[in-house]
């Protein structure tokens, strides 16, 4: 990590009480495949570029759009009632002004940390998608795999200045519903928010 990142991370990590995890050995370098699917082994260093990482995010956004379209084709009132969707409060990870990812007040170091933390928090919602999504399950599997790859890439940039959040199994239980419309509304809301989250993260990735 260069001195520019070090100086930016240190005060932020201290202010938020982030724990620096010291690794006992350096990870083994490995290339990132053209489809970002060749190796997602934890702890293995992925050799990539900002352009490839940006391409990975854009592919995920396209995948999410395809999944939303698939749901909408089966539901006449798809995404037509924002009020009803808002009632399904899922406490989804979102970008805020303080996260440094917006054009106003942009801070690459802070944005990278928030993006990584948010994607880790999204894992429980991806569990819900895998359990409840009735469309092409290959899309869900690809999305999860690509997000794990992106998390690995981002962790390399922030030198493990973040810890993995505990799995909230209670939340997964609370999200269950026997009502088909409510279930689809939650899936749409998760996909829509994840798409927005990834879009905001692109600004930090594009910075060399």
UniProtKB/Swiss-Prot annotation:
Pfam families: IL6. GO terms for cellular component: extracellular space; interleukin-6 receptor complex. Keywords: Acute phase, Cytokine, Disulfide bond, Glycoprotein, Growth factor, Phosphoprotein, Secreted, Signal. Residues 1-29 form the signal peptide. GO terms for biological process: acute-phase response; cell surface receptor signaling pathway via JAK-STAT; cellular response to hydrogen peroxide; cellular response to lipopolysaccharide; defense response to virus; glucose homeostasis; hepatic immune response; hepatocyte proliferation. Glycans are attached at residue 38. Disulfide bonds join 72-78, 101-111. The modification Phosphoserine is found at residue 81. Belongs to the IL-6 superfamily. Component of a hexamer of two molecules each of IL6, IL6R and IL6ST; first binds to IL6R to associate with the signaling subunit IL6ST. Interacts with IL6R (via the N-terminal ectodomain); this interaction may be affected by IL6R-binding with SORL1, hence decreasing IL6 cis signaling. Interacts with SORL1 (via the N-terminal ectodomain); this interaction leads to IL6 internalization and lysosomal degradation. May form a trimeric complex with the soluble SORL1 ectodomain and soluble IL6R receptor; this interaction might stabilize circulating IL6, hence promoting IL6 trans signaling. This is Interleukin-6. It comes from Bos taurus (Bovine). The lineage of its organism: Eukaryota, Metazoa, Chordata, Craniata, Vertebrata. The gene is IL6.
